Amino acid sequence: MFKTFVGAFKNKDIRKKIIYTLLILVVVRVGSLLPIPGVDTNYFSSLLSGINTGDLSYLSAFTGGSFERMSLFALSITPYITSSIIMQLLTIAIPKLEEMQKEGEDGRKKIASITRYVTIGLSLIESIAMAVGFGRSGLIKDSAQLSTLHYVVCIIVVVAALTAGSAVLMWLGERITEKGVGNGISIVLLINIISGMPSDFATLYSTFVAPKTPAKGVLAAVIILAILIVMVVLVCFLQDGERRIPVQYSQKVSGRRTVGGQSTNIPLKVNTAGVMPIIFASSLMQFPVIIAQLFGKSYEWTRYLSSSYWCRVEAPKYSIGLLVYIVLLIIFAYFYTSITFNPIEVADNLKKAGGVIPGITPGKSTSEYLNKILNYIVFIGAVGLLIIALIPIMCTGFFNASVSFGGTSIIIIVGVVLETLKQIESQMCNRYYKGFLSE
């Protein structure tokens, strides 16, 4: 990894892209510290401090702490992520969008444009809900003393600032994709997660290391480090692990030449769905809890949905929520994989191109074979995701040490780093061959 970065900095063009990316990330972090005019950030922080941190940990990680501070980038890129998920689901339900997706680069540009508009719409809705819902309760400074007109103006300012902040982050992410290195949105999400890690490590230290004797403290630190390393290795396996299905193409005689006959493979990734099953399952379980707690309501049933209660030894009945979470994660793993990989479509394309999986009849038998292998691989990937997701949850329940970087964050960090390194290496190879051919 370090050799890749050293080699990249030796190349002038790639070095410029890396510096450009770093400068934009500085802008992102500065924007996350800029307060919104008229907002009492201290009040909002105190409001959130009364909420179980386990329920807002993923939101805190994705926004880099901007949500608690109610800064310019408080919504972060979560509206864009939600919009992308919505568009992926709509491509299945709406045939016109599915056709647009198959049009190649032009179709992808149209879908990207629609995604931007959906992002702005979602940002506006979320901003209005936050400003109006919490305005009179203290989010707006001195709201009780403000006139109706002045209060409405403050609401408009907050809504405009939050919506504009989300739009600016989306634009900055696209600039990184276009002129920098890596996927811009993923890079922004990565820096937000990393920015919250120092406080998380401080929490781990104060909970497991500081209260103990030096010998036990060192042992606890070694165990924590070992768990993190195991999680990273497991994520690397899930991200890069794949089952390759061999494919043989038939030979065709064109004049005096024999065309085709080459062998290739269909790579089926162990974790085809990526981090989406965890996000879907967590959001579905935590949304009712967050809404109830933000509005000052406390119900017994919310504890079954709250991850901070699932692994408490003194209250094992709440583990029912954990079982529901496990079932949801597995269901979403299969569901999202069915969106990204269609065995029937792949089998049909192979048949049209003259490709055959050795020992499998083209057509229906091929699709059934691919579906069988895919179901097996998805199950392995889902189990791996469960292990990664449950370790932080168990840490929260057994030891009451909630940290914002959970399994989702580790998957995103490792995935984005690997993807960015591969892109840098690819650009280095392209530069090398161009230089070689020009000599």
What does each of the following model-derived ranges do?
Residues 1-101, 106-439:
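N-terminal cationic and glycine-rich segments that engage phosphates or anionic surfaces
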